[in-house]
């Protein structure tokens, strides 16, 4: 790793399977390390920050406990100065909408990327327009997540809320 040229736009995402291995590698290389699968809870991110264990975190909405928990994790990462990838392990149009919304709440200097997970599945679950302007993705400006669920695919709602 240390023979890579300095300044190379390259990171190691989840390079090792254990905490100990990641921390050991972090101390032996100047290549930035992004944690994801081992950073699922607030406590994990706090521990990584306290040990100077990374340059960034991959926030996976479903694995990390949903949008509310990811918001708190995002705040910890911003306080630690970490770059973040906002993603999910797999996705749908609805999951993608949530990813985009969370990604938009990050200060741009901390946003590494937003993963477009829509191509990971064959079934389209919702419709919505997502614009890319100057390299940045933006969510629809309509209510909620900004997408219209395809009820012919998902079935009728079990419960709905109205104003």
Question: How should these model regions be labeled?
Answer:
Residues 1-11:
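Alpha/beta enzyme core
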Residues 8, 17-32, 39-136, 140:
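Shared catalytic-loop signature of beta/alpha-barrel
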Residues 14:
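Non-cysteine beta-strand/loop elements that form the S-adenosyl-L-methionine
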Residues 154-163:
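Active-site microenvironment of metallo-dependent hydrolases
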